[in-house]
């Protein structure tokens, strides 16, 4: 549950960071150019593709990938995956620009704390794939968050 709340808060931050960033989309059949739109921010994974649906690109996926809990704290690794579309061979730069906006939003968090409870650890990592599925481009960001581990309440304590 804590991980879901973390990714929800992170999706809100990401959505605010990219909301005014117009990126190209795949042209629909019969059109020379696609429309420009901000990346959709999605929890977890892209939904299965159905016939007749618009292309998913551009997008930003936010998902908790792994975690570890000890007595005092929980560490959660969250991936932020950026996908863009461009028929130009410098299309990977769209991914870098989206990543830069997200990174700026993350590094601007007061005290590196999101929603008053999730502490961002540095470094923020990112990587691209050597082989990109042209004309689609992808970049992966890796963030690590510290959360205070919920403590059990002793039923015999009187509050």
Where are these regions (language model features)?
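Extracellular structured ligand-interaction cores
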Residues: 57-59, 75-77, 136-140
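Residue-level signal for secondary-structure boundary sites
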Residues: 70, 86-90, 147-151
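Acidic-leaning, charged glycine-interspersed low-complexity segments
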Residues: 93-159
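Short acidic, glycine/tyrosine-flanked loop/strand segments centered on an H-E-D-like triad
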Residues: 75-88
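Ordered, soluble secondary-structure elements with a strong preference for glycine-centered loop motifs
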Residues: 4, 89-96
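Short, solvent-exposed beta-strand/turn "edge" segments of beta-rich domains on protein surfaces
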Residues: 67-73, 130-134
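Small/polar-rich, solvent-exposed N-terminal microdomains that initiate assembly or binding
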Residues: 1-70, 154-159
